[in-house]
Structures are given as structure tokens and as C-alpha cells.
């Protein structure tokens, strides 16, 4: 990409990082803490990690996936931390940019709806080299896959070959969230590690060169 395009993305990302929509003009209840948008867009990366929203550790660090979920995701991708955080290789743009808070049971709330509505389409337009989108969880799958998303996350991920073979650009691979909460899901669905992960790793390595 040209320096002009890089500057345009940098300027737009700076606007996102200064966003306060969920406090000043929220949909429903306002964000219960000070916003701290976390994203790593890229004008040169070919791979987009479309995740859900930061958790508590990421809210503190200001870097995506600096937690156990990140360790598991990097293992799924078979990449090092240096590769993962290299913005010439990966763009990381969650559906919600700020930690949304927790529910009464201690689980993270869904991504804030304001983020995608305000920012996602123009961000995608500024990342034209993306040719593989890893949709992590239902919210990313709904936005990036539309009608191609199946009724449940399990059905969507299970049907990854059909989704991959569809004539769409960029290519999409649906994934569950790498949270420890999904360890049981992984045990109940051994095909994920046996079939999908080897294919995913080969596509990642192909794009990283």
C-alpha cells in the first residue's frame, strides 16, 4: 500500500482509539468504565483476526490477546508472538473495541453494538489486502458471513469446508472463541483439532511465506 493509504488508516485508527460513543451516545446502558479501544488494523496484512471484544487483561494491557485465550489462539495458528503481533502479517480488529464489562455470573458481556455500526465497514475498506478472515465467535460470524452463518456456532464451524469453498472474497474460516470456557466444546468436537486446524495452519503459513 502507498504511504498515503497507510496514513489514512493510521488517522482513522486514531479516531477509533479516541471513540467514546458507548459512553456519550450509547445503545442501551453506557459502558460501565472509561473506554479503552483495542485494535491493530493493517494496510498490508493479508490475514484478519475478527474477534469478539477485549477481556479484563486486554483492557489493562491495551494489546489484543495478551491472555490465555491469546496463547490458545496462537497455538491454533501455529505462530509465534512476534509473528502474531506483526501488523504486516496480521490485522486484529474485534467486533467490540472496548472491554464490555461482566454479567452477574462473571462472564464477559457481548461486544458493544456501537462499534461495528460506527467503524467496521470503513475500517474494512482501508484494509484491501485482507484475503483471509478468521471469524471468532457468533458476532464476527454474523457480521462477516451474513446469511452464510448457520443457526449455531457449532454448525457454522462444522460446515467450514462449504463456507471455504463458497465464491466469496475474502475467504472466511469460522472459529470458536479460544477461551478456556470452550475447553469442553473442543473435547466434544475433536474434528476441530483433527481437520480444521491443520487446514487453518497451512493457509496461515501460505500467507506468511
What are these regions (language model features)?
Residues 2-208:
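A polyanion-binding, active-site-adjacent surface
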Amino acid at each position: 500500500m502507498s504511504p498515503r493509504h497507510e496514513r489514512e488508516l493510521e488517522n482513522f485508527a486514531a479516531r477509533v482509539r479516541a471513540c467514546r460513543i458507548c459512553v456519550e451516545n450509547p445503545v442501551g446502558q453506557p459502558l460501565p468504565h472509561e473506554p479503552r479501544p483495542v485494535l491493530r488494523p493493517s494496510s498490508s496484512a493479508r490475514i484478519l483476526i475478527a474477534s469478539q471484544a477485549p477481556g479484563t487483561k486486554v483492557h489493562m494491557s491495551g494489546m489484543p490477546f495478551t491472555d490465555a485465550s491469546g496463547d490458545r489462539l496462537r497455538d491454533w495458528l501455529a505462530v509465534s508472538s512476534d509473528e502474531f503481533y506483526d501488523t504486516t502479517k496480521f490485522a486484529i480488529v474485534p467486533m467490540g473495541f472496548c472491554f464490555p464489562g461482566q454479567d452477574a455470573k462473571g462472564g464477559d458481556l457481548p461486544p458493544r453494538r456501537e462499534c461495528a455500526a460506527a467503524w467496521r465497514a470503513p475500517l474494512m475498506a482501508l484494509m484491501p489486502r485482507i484475503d483471509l478472515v478468521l471469524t471468532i465467535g457468533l458476532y464476527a460470524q454474523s457480521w462477516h458471513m451474513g446469511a452464510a452463518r448457520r443457526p449455531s456456532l457449532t454448525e457454522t464451524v462444522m460446515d467450514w469446508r462449504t463456507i471455504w469453498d463458497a465464491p466469496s472474497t475474502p475467504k472466511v474460516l469460522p472459529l470458536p472463541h479460544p477461551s478456556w470456557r470452550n475447553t469442553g466444546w473442543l473435547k466434544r468436537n475433536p474434528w476441530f483439532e483433527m481437520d480444521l486446524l491443520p487446514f487453518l495452519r497451512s493457509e496461515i503459513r501460505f500467507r506468511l511465506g
